[in-house]
Amino acid sequence: MRIVKLGFISIIVFSVIIFLISLLVPSHVRISRAIDIRGDNVDTVIANPHSWKDWNELYNDSALVTFLSVKPGMVETMWRYKHIQVPGNFRIEHSAGISVVQWYFDFHLKWYPWEKFGSIIFDKEFGPPMERSLNNLKKLVENSP
């Protein structure tokens, strides 16, 4: 009986410690990448969902992307994959023939420890395809007439 009691108390204490450590992980995570692009038609390429297959590696058949708003300098989208919805926005600033494109995803997490600990790998999971996509976008825009 003592071993069962010790095991039960150990599981409770371990769970509380894991929960308290998870409180140190933020509940809002932003994954962001940016690139400088020479060209004036960056806004139109990003705002055109039909051109995304030419440059965006994250845009595929399993992800549903909804365009929420397209304004000068800002394209707001909502990405849905299975049951997860994530805002993914493009901010575009033009200056002296160069456009700075910032692409970011905002993850809002619940208090669950497994969600918070899982968010630690988001940058490694989303960052490289975002960088490759932005480089593809740069090649597409700079090589277009």
Q: Model regions: which residues?
A:
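Extracytoplasmic/periplasmic/luminal assembly and interaction segments
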Residues: 39, 49-95, 102
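Beta-strand/loop substructures that line and gate deep hydrophobic ligand-binding cavities in soluble
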Residues: 80-139, 143-145
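Hydrophobic ligand-binding cavity/cleft-lining segments
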Residues: 2-61
